[in-house]
Design a protein with these regions (language model features):
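A short beta-strand micro-motif
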Residues: 4-10
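Acidic, low-complexity, intrinsically disordered interaction modules
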Residues: 10-105
Length: 105
């Protein structure tokens, strides 16, 4: 099992919060992601669209992991402000793939 780290940034104040989370993927799924990165030269928006269209099952796994990590990061932020936690996000989250894959090519 290969572990893939997905990352993002949560901008809720002037500082913003970075987070990352590890997702376990089959080796074949990781190879498919690398293939997409190679084909598209590292354009993040294109990666997201191609991944969503070409490998929707992998995209779904990453999307859920990113959603949970964003929700966790947002709740940490709310707690630090003394505000109550929420159980769902009312703003957009994004699937961001790690640059380490892009650096390989």
């Amino acid at each position: 099992m290969e572990k893939l780290t997905v990352y993002g940034e949560l901008c809720v104040d002037e500082y913003g919060t970075e987070w990352n989370t590890e997702v376990e993927l089959e080796d074949e799924q990781v190879r498919n992601i690398i293939k997409i990165l190679m084909l598209n030269g590292g354009d993040t928006d294109v990666e997201r669209m191609c991944l969503k269209d070409t490998f929707p099952d992998i995209y779904d796994v990453l999307d859920k992991a990113c959603y949970k990590a964003t929700l966790d990061a947002y709740n940490e932020y709310l707690m630090s402000c003394g505000k109550p936690e929420v159980d769902k996000l009312d703003f957009k989250h994004e699937v961001n793939l790690p640059y380490k894959f892009q650096d390989m090519f």
